[in-house]
Structure formats: C-alpha cells, structure tokens
Amino acid sequence: MSAAQLSTFSVNGHLFGVEVAVVQEVIRYQPMTRVPLAPAALAGLINLRGQVITAVDLRRRLGFPERAAGELAMDVIVRTSDGLVSLLVDRIGDVVEVAQETFEEPPETLAGIARELIRGAYKLDHALLLLLDVQGAVDLPPLDNGSGTVVATPM
C-alpha cells in the first residue's frame, strides 16, 4: 500500500493539503506590500529574510469570502516552478499520511475556480481532505488594463 505525506491547512472551513515536498516552511502572518493593479488573489509581496516573495490569498483565489476584520492569515511558503510563493491560509493543520488507494476525484459539489484547483480528495476519519494544485493556485490570470491590452501578471 503506497502512502503520501501531505501538509494540511484550512481555508474558509475546508481542509486542504499539499505534498510535504513542496512546502519550504510555515510562518506567521507577514506585513505585505500591495501591488497596484494586481489580480485580487495576489495579496502582495512579503520580505522573507531579504527575499521578496509573492503572496497569494487562497480565500480570494478559491472564490471564498474575505477574512473577518482583524483575522490574520498564516503563510505557507511553497516551492513552485516560478520560485517561492506564499499561500495565505486561515489555519495550519498537521502533516498527515494518506493511502493512495483512498484518493478520489474532486467532489462534484465544488464549483467554479475551486473545482479547477483541486486535484482530488482523501476521506479522513474526521474530514474530507482536498488536494490543492499548488502550481494552478499560484498561476494567476494575466491583467487586462481596460483597453483590451493584456498586461503581464506580476510574479
């Protein structure tokens, strides 16, 4: 029986997981510099020990409501093909081991962009663990400056 290790976190009450191998570290909320005209999901840029990292708000990216005022996100720093990126999440979970045999297709109840960014699901004893497509989550759509000209997304 083959197993995978996933680092888990929650966003809007949903449990998500990403492969442990892509997670560099998990840190408390970091002050951010906003990027003018950036897509809503691009929360800003953070300074991680002198390295500038793009922060993607998973609530916005997945189409969930905004966080309550005063509620700070946590940063899950992941390695992608574009370098390090911070995923802003509500809460950090544990590292769990899941049997590959329990992997299922994404639930039919997922709608919109969330359905496109979920690779599948694992049924745990206490919850449904949604496997996030990390690269898809950080690949933001290009900007349209209103004149019909597409502007490159800052990354």
Task: Describe the residue ranges of each PLM region.
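An acidic, low-aromatic, low-complexity terminal/linker signal
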Residues: 1-155
